[in-house]
Amino acid sequence: IHCRYVVGADGGRSTVRQLCGLSFEGYTHPERLVSTNLRYDFEARGFARANFVLDPVHWAVIVIADRHGLWRITYGEDSALPEETISERLVEHYRALLPDRDPYKLEAFAPFRVHERCASSFRAGRVLLAGDAAHVCNPFGGLGLTSGLLDGNLLGDALPAVIHGAAHDDLLDRYAAERRRVFLEVTGPAAAENKRRLKE
C-alpha cells in the first residue's frame, strides 16, 4: 500500500503510535473497574437513562445499554482484590446499588483498568493520531468517546483539504496541536473530576 498519510485510530494500545516512537504520558488509576450488564427494570424505579451514584465505597455509573431492557452498571473496586472472586463481590455491590431485592439477571461482567494518558504528539511526519490512539480517559461522562469523534470530524475536514491542495500542510500541525491542547486542558481534567466526584 502506498499513501501520502496514515491515520492511527487503532485504540489505546495503538501500534501506529508505538511504531512512531511517541510516548503515552499519564497515569493508571489504582482502582479496577468492573463493567456489568444486567436485566432489571430501573426505569420503573425512577432511574434516568444515565445515573451517577456518588458514594465513597459503592460509587458507580448506571446507564441503559439497549432498547430491550439491558442496563450497564460500572463500579470500582480495589485492584488488589483477586479477579477470580469478582462474581462473589458483585452481589454485595448490587445490594448497595439496586433500590430493592427484586430479582435481576446478570448477563455479563468484565474487569478493566482505566488510564488518563495523552500522546506526546498527535503528529509524526505523515502520521496523525486520533481517538484513543491519541488520548484515553476514564469512561465517566463519555468524554473519551466524544473527544474521539471530534478528532475524527476535524481531521476528516483537514486531511482532504491538504491532500487536494485547498490548504497547506501546516493545517495538520494545527489539528495535532489544538486537539492535544483541548485534551490536556479540558477533556482530561473534566473526566478526572467526574471520577473524583463519584467517590465523594
Regions found by a protein language model. Give the residues of each.
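Core beta-strand elements of the Rossmann-like FAD/NAD(P) dinucleotide-binding domain
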Residues: 1-5, 9, 123-126
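Conserved FAD-binding catalytic core of PHBH/FMO-like flavoproteins
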Residues: 5-114
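Phosphate-coordinating loops and pocket residues in cytosolic domains that bind phosphorylated ligands
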Residues: 18-21, 124, 177
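FAD/FMN-dependent oxidoreductases across multiple families
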Residues: 84-141, 147, 167, 186
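Basic, amphipathic juxtamembrane/active-site segments
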Residues: 141-154, 158-161
